[in-house]
Design a protein with these regions (language model features):
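Hydrophobic packing residues within well-ordered alpha-helices of enzyme cores
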Residues: 26, 51-55, 166, 170, ...
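Short active-site oxyanion
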Residues: 37-41, 63-65, 153, 213-214, ...
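Short, structured coil segments at secondary-structure junctions
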Residues: 58, 63, 71, 174-176, ...
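Conserved acidic, metal-coordinating active-site core of Asp-based
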Residues: 100, 104-218, 222-226, 230
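Short, hinge-like loop/turn segments at secondary-structure boundaries
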Residues: 57-61, 85-86, 125-129, 197-198, ...
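Mg2+-dependent phosphoryl-transfer enzymes with acidic/Ser/Thr/Gly-rich catalytic loops
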Residues: 2-6, 23, 189-273
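Asp-based phosphoryl-transfer active-site loop
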Residues: 3-19
Length: 273
């Protein structure tokens, strides 16, 4: 009998294929896991509103489950809508992050209840976030002035060739005040200091009376490393970046386009010993 009670799943490059769809075999594996009493946590850098449609598609609003959004900045109960965990950026950092992006001549965005907020509505890389989240782009003239509400993260979008250099510069400038790290070839996350998927999952497990040994986590990106290393069973997709594979207990033989999540769920949760 599996000790896994919580299954945390990254979305893009993990649960969904490159068309942003959950395949039938993977959906069936998740339904079977839920039937065994496993709580599904959709754990992503996406905003909450960008995860909600998938949660509803999987029936988590009725069967139960959680949305972990903003790479751990917020956790919401799918069934009740209750916010279980929320961590926001220091408001003073918002204009400084905007100025940093402007100095680098790159786009930076954040979110409100209606969609994605950005000064550059035609930016190629910023529009990738619209495709990923299925949220509309809201163009504003001055993002720093517009953001007068708490935000869980800001997202820098840029040409992949510039990612590492810009990220290093940002990490130096905001050291000790915010965490900046890449989450895809063209995204750099800016989140409150110490916010990560593992930290928020640990808080959720405490609320549930469970431990890390009851957690299985699946992911592919650098922002998934913390939860994969933390989980009792950490799983990296075949398509994961090498540092992610290096910290995993198991690497799937299939990638996200060929039911890698289903492979892991069948192996560690559904298999009867």
């Amino acid at each position: 009998m599996s000790d896994i009670k919580v299954l945390a799943l990254d979305l893009d490059g993990t649960l969904t294929n490159d068309q942003k769809l959950v395949t039938p075999r993977t959906r069936a594996a998740l339904d079977a896991a839920i039937a065994k009493g496993v709580t599904i946590v959709l754990a992503s850098g996406r905003p909450t509103a960008g995860i909600q449609p998938l949660a509803e598609e999987l029936g988590l609003d009725k069967k139960g489950g959680c949305i972990l959004s903003y790479n751990g900045g917020k956790i919401v109960d799918c069934r009740t809508g209750e916010t279980l965990v929320e961590k926001t950026l220091d408001p003073a950092l918002v204009p400084e992050l905007c100025a940093f992006a402007a100095a680098q001549d790159i786009a930076i965005l954040t979110y409100n209840r209606e969609g994605i907020v950005c000064e550059r509505d035609k930016d190629e890389w910023a529009n990738k976030e619209c495709f990923t989240t299925k949220l509309p782009m809201i163009h504003v003239d001055d993002l720093a002035s517009y953001v007068n509400y708490p935000v869980c993260k800001m997202l820098i979008t840029l040409d992949p060739a510039r990612r590492d250099a810009v990220c290093a510069a940002g990490q130096q400038q905001f050291a000790g005040r915010a965490d900046l790290y890449p989450s895809s070839p063209f995204f750099i996350e800016a989140v409150p200091r110490g916010v990560a998927k593992d930290d928020s999952l640990a808080e959720l497990l405490r609320r549930m009376g469970l431990t890390r040994e009851n957690l299985m986590a699946c992911g592919d990106g650098l922002n998934d490393r913390s939860m994969i290393a933390y989980a009792g069973v950490g799983v990296a997709m075949q398509n994961a970046e090498q540092p992610v594979k290096d910290c995993a207990d198991y690497v799937t033989t299939a990638d996200n386009n060929h039911d890698g999540v289903a492979e892991a769920v069948e192996k560690f949760i559904l298999r009867e010993d």
